[in-house]
């Protein structure tokens, strides 16, 4: 049995549903979901991410606009743009691509986005709803939301009796991932780079989510037989076998060594990454639906 979770295939199945719901909104209610993506500066990786998100939004039938700002843009100017988008009825989702230049306070920017349009799920109100298990009208961060669908596909929605370990404590992935697993009745441990005996902690996991941002830190003997392994890490390492100066992408998990002992595992690339973009589309669609008190897409 193939135990490698195909994130591209699963994401495409979700996008098909988003497209269908978008057509319903347009035909029945004359509503077109709209997303605004903001990028500040000229970081090449950020531009790649923004382009892929914008293309996917257009593919889904959304109104999509990109704001490409110079790295000299002031925090005040960025906040003014966000205020304009907050009041724009055509825009239902606002995304500011991170990281921002050092002179801009990231927290001020993420909290300036109206929580109803916070399709990244970073606003304190959305974080609070998630923490309090009020998920019906919360906007969930895209990567944990996508990872959770992958876990549910393997284990079902009720994770009672299962031990889950999340390696990583970021506000973007680690903490919301732990909250989602807790809401699904798993027994959850949050571990990180300073956790004592991290290998032993990981070995206890029926479900192991690696989101620490260290290439291939999770070794074969850290994972118990039959575990579900979700690799959120995206790390670029040297690949001399490809030529001088060449690199390749790897996750936080030593994939080749571990894949044979897992019940299911996500690859990098092609695992959680496509699901992140798919869930951004779901969040934008649902933000538009909620604005008009219409049913949301449930996966």
UniProtKB/Swiss-Prot annotation:
Its Gene Ontology molecular function terms? methenyltetrahydrofolate cyclohydrolase activity; methylenetetrahydrofolate dehydrogenase (NADP+) activity
Top-rank taxon: Bacteria
UniProt keywords, alphabetically: Amino-acid biosynthesis, Histidine biosynthesis, Hydrolase, Methionine biosynthesis, Multifunctional enzyme, NADP, One-carbon metabolism, Oxidoreductase, Purine biosynthesis
Could you state one GO cellular component term attached to this entry?
cytosol
Segments forming a coiled coil:
none
Q: What is its EC number?
A: 1.5.1.5, 3.5.4.9
**Residues passing through the membrane, by range:** none
Xref: Pfam families: THF_DHG_CYH, THF_DHG_CYH_C
Q: What InterPro entries would the database entry show?
A: Aminoacid_DH-like_N_sf (IPR046346), NAD(P)-bd_dom_sf (IPR036291), THF_DH/CycHdrlase (IPR000672), THF_DH/CycHdrlase_cat_dom (IPR020630), THF_DH/CycHdrlase_CS (IPR020867), THF_DH/CycHdrlase_NAD-bd_dom (IPR020631)
Question: In the UniProt record, does the keyword Oxidoreductase occur?
Answer: yes
Primary role: Catalyzes the oxidation of 5,10-methylenetetrahydrofolate to 5,10-methenyltetrahydrofolate and then the hydrolysis of 5,10-methenyltetrahydrofolate to 10-formyltetrahydrofolate.
As for family, the record states: Belongs to the tetrahydrofolate dehydrogenase/cyclohydrolase family.
Q: Assembly and interactions? A: Homodimer.
Q: What is the official name of this protein in its record?
A: Bifunctional protein FolD
Q: Which organism is it from?
A: Bartonella quintana (strain Toulouse)
Q: What is the lineage of its organism?
A: Bacteria, Pseudomonadati, Pseudomonadota, Alphaproteobacteria, Hyphomicrobiales
